[in-house]
Amino acid sequence: MKHRIQHIHFVGIGGSGMSGIAEVLLNLGYTISGSDLQESAVTRRLAGLGAHVAIGHTAANVAGAGAIVTSTAVAGDNPEVIAARAAGIPVVPRAIMLAELMRLKRGIAVAGTHGKTTTTSLVASVLAAGDLDPTFVIGGRLTSAGANARLGQGEYIVVEADESDASFLNLLPVMAIVTNIDADHMDTYGHDVARLKSAFIEFTQRLPFYGSAVLCADDANVREIMPFVSRPITTYGLSPDAHVRGENVQADGTRMRFTVQRQDRATALPPLAIELNLPGLHNVRNALAAVAVATELGVPDEAIAQALASFKGVGRRFTQTGEFPVPAAHGGGTFTLIDDYGHHPVEMAATLAAARGAWPDRRIVLAFQPHRYTRTRDCFEDFVRVLGGADAVLLTEVYAAGEPPLVAADGRALARALRVAGRIEPVFVEDVADLPQAVLDFVRDGDVVVVMGAGSISKVPGLVGELA
């Protein structure tokens, strides 16, 4: 891809989708600059790798750039975007730049409403264990790599494909994984589930004729689109008819044990015993997707099993922050703290089920910050149902993510609905800054505290650890 444009500037370089692309381009030898509203571990890492990172957005930041990259989170009136257009500098959407990266290698793209980051990470890990040395660009920090991107020397690039803004339709992979299809980011699809499903069909149709669609057989919406996918299909899941099928699934603390049965065209392959270093049935499905890809690419069974057994996880995906002391005033003892990115009811239910499976005899305390008023409105009853499944709930105000407040779709409304449902008496903490102390005031010996959300609540586990 090396050509006359040598200097590429990223507006919002600290974002999960932007930073990985920037890092790969840095390693390809490009001059990378970028800006973000605040310094973070991500911006510091990129600066340490050689990027010039500015805090704050100003027109001067784009000086010398041959192109600037933006995400859908960057508004058109951003001063850097305005300056670039005035200077005739190409403004490139993030997904287009990712598509350009994928042209350098054979692309494996992971799409789906839930589980993309973990599945992408698992696929990258099993390919690495099979000595395929993949490049990867992931929406979360792969713990074993210490980063969310890496430039490998192998022929494959594994990427997370974003359906939230339909930008995954810019990608041209040779393998496409669809983990599930759920009603989220529906503003993009005119609140029409049929349009959402059509987008996923189009995603698979962008595969070449020799490509492969790897589809989850356990998801009803994915099953609905299968008749319209005209590329070779490999299915995976716990369903009896899946080509790559998990059987005899057992939880063992925070690990899952299961056997994989596989079909290679009409031939049955030997069973594969897996011990997955992640909890929950949803992660069994994510691992089965990785097994399906690895099997198709010829990764040895021993390498697949080793990669899944030693998988160290992804940042903020059921991350065990540690064991912390309960204040003496509350009887002492210890509690377990889990950090998780989940913000949709389906994701939340899966994470809570994983916590129950890992610690069946302990109280599960959920500290949750809703993300976006529109999602809270659209999924309100589902949020009430899922929140009611925890043993105790601490609830904050909605993280707006730039949206204006909506009547009856805020944190207080959720708290009221939980009380009316009678399942639970939530503790409402209006300011998320007060949540770390609220957790310590509430927790008791043996509790498992799951801190969950996609907004500013991400800082809470670290603050709880400092206060404990």
From Swiss-Prot:
Keywords: ATP-binding, Cell cycle, Cell division, Cell shape, Cell wall biogenesis/degradation, Cytoplasm, Ligase, Nucleotide-binding, Peptidoglycan synthesis. Pathway: Cell wall biogenesis; peptidoglycan biosynthesis. ATP binds at G112, T113, H114, G115, K116, T117, T118. GO terms for biological process: cell division; cell wall organization; peptidoglycan biosynthetic process; regulation of cell shape. SUPFAM superfamilies: MurCD N-terminal domain, MurD-like peptide ligases, catalytic domain, MurD-like peptide ligases, peptide-binding domain. HAMAP family: MurC. This is UDP-N-acetylmuramate--L-alanine ligase.
